[in-house]
Regions:
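C-terminal domain-closing interface element
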Residues: 5, 9, 16, 123-129
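A short beta-alpha structural unit
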Residues: 4-12, 32-52, 73, 77-79
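Flexible, glycine/charged-enriched surface loops at secondary-structure junctions
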Residues: 29-37, 65-70, 128-129
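Short amphipathic alpha-helices in soluble, non-transmembrane regions
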Residues: 18-27
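Zn-dependent metallopeptidase/amidohydrolase metal-coordination segment
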Residues: 66-122
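Hydrophobic alpha-helix feature that most strongly marks membrane-spanning transmembrane helices
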Residues: 28, 60, 83-86, 124-127
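N-terminal/domain-start segments enriched in small and hydrophobic, helix-friendly residues
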Residues: 15, 19, 40-71, 112-118, ...
Length: 129
């Protein structure tokens, strides 16, 4: 018996759905059974994000970092919230790490502490907005 597990992710739900359809079509060609499980909702870049503006400003103040914005597949778990509340303003940030989803995956604990402290400052600043 061969089992293949995939977790399709995309910032665009239609692309994620298209990939799932391709996988199901390919499986059908070989008469494989396909079971669809949980779906991670995507969320697209919001050019008018007030939360991102605050985050950018606070990262500069706290860490003297000029943020570089980039889209990745990481952090899409927050899309679960976006799937339920599409008008929600969402950002993702986190500690340093490497080797995601591999046996070599690790988390930099000092960076984790810094990000936890930063999160507390960010939430405090958010309540003043």
């Amino acid at each position: 018996e061969i089992r293949v597990w995939t977790f399709n992710r995309s910032g665009d739900d239609s692309r994620q759905d298209a990939m799932a359809e391709e996988i199901m079509s390919l499986a059908d060609v070989f008469d494989y059974k396909v079971t669809q499980g949980a779906k991670f909702f995507g969320w697209k870049f919001n050019p008018d994000s007030k939360m991102r503006e605050l985050h950018t400003k606070l990262m500069k103040e706290v860490f003297d970092i000029d943020l570089k914005m980039e889209a990745t597949h990481g952090g899409l778990e927050t899309g679960v919230f976006f799937g339920k509340e599409p008008e929600m303003d969402i950002i993702c940030f986190g500690p340093k790490g490497s080797g995601a989803h591999t046996p070599e995956e690790y988390l930099d604990l000092e960076s984790f502490k810094e990000m936890f402290d930063y999160l507390c400052k960010f939430l405090a600043a958010l309540t003043k907005e």
